[in-house]
């Protein structure tokens, strides 16, 4: 695998809409009408579909769409010791999830992602596959704590098991790891130790590490940016009309800029994406900018999600060509800092 990638690399955050036939297969499996082997085949077929969509759109660094994950915390809690589920809780509107409870010491059992990542690698059009994993603070924040003295203690035990999982992914050749922390700015007083737990989760990881943050009070994060040991911060920006950008002007590593609003079915035009990128490049060095949607696309209809990605890439290509005329060609896939 080359250590270089084209200037303004395009990527996705992680999740992608499940095809309707996969949702139906999952429903039938839960009703006892589809066996586990057929369900696994359906998951694999869905990953192939996602990879083809990403290829059609022209995404430089794709994911597997998180086809096997019902929810970003539940998936990992099901696979770790120390968690128990009591039932569903309401998140917002008519959306529910199985909020886990921590009832014992959190321990790592077996690799959680290796099989699905190996399959995604086998069908991907590029070796530059990104793998996402929910971070320690978000899992601790979105779980009930019935065991640990403090949430901080819980988060640091989570960080240790996440670190094991990430290192297993690195061992099979994954070069880009994204830690998802949408909850990191829930409470201002937690941010400093939350960052410490994230750093613990990526300790000794010698590939590119991305931190995805979205939808919250970015100003809580800004005073602590210098403590983050990640190569890239990936942000939801379009939904905010880019107003948080000024908080990250001093950030001197990579930044993933969200230029697609995932909570709006309106499809951004190619020129809209290009113009937004030109404005963002007034704040950040071109070689440090990656291009992505604000967040995961799973809640959008698939046709809309795909067209949003197509337009995102086309808009990026316009600005990429403008940069090439100024002498910019490639950027690096290597990690930028030692951990």
Curated annotation (Swiss-Prot):
> Cofactor: bound how, per the entry note?
Binds 1 zinc ion per subunit.
**Which SUPFAM superfamilies is this protein grouped with?**
UROD/MetE-like
* One Gene Ontology MF term: zinc ion binding
Offer one example of a GO biological process linked to this entry: methylation
| Entry EC no(s) | 2.1.1.-
**Which Pfam family is an annotated match for this chain, by its short name?**
Meth_synt_2
- What gene does the UniProt entry assign to this protein? metE
User: Metal-binding: is it a keyword of this entry?
Assistant: yes
Q: What does this protein do?
A: Catalyzes the transfer of a methyl group to L-homocysteine resulting in methionine formation. The physiological methyl donor is unknown.
Q: State the protein's name.
A: Methionine synthase
**Organism encoding this protein:** Sulfolobus acidocaldarius (strain ATCC 33909 / DSM 639 / JCM 8929 / NBRC 15157 / NCIMB 11770)
| Pathway(s) annotated for this protein in UniProt | Amino-acid biosynthesis; L-methionine biosynthesis via de novo pathway
Which residues are Zn(2+)-binding? 212, 214, 295
Q: Which cofactor does it need?
A: Zn(2+)
Which keywords are on file for this protein? Amino-acid biosynthesis, Metal-binding, Methionine biosynthesis, Methyltransferase, Transferase, Zinc
- RNA-binding listed as a keyword: no
Q: Which family does it belong to?
A: Belongs to the archaeal MetE family.
In terms of PANTHER family, this protein maps to: 5-METHYLTETRAHYDROPTEROYLTRIGLUTAMATE--HOMOCYSTEINE METHYLTRANSFERASE
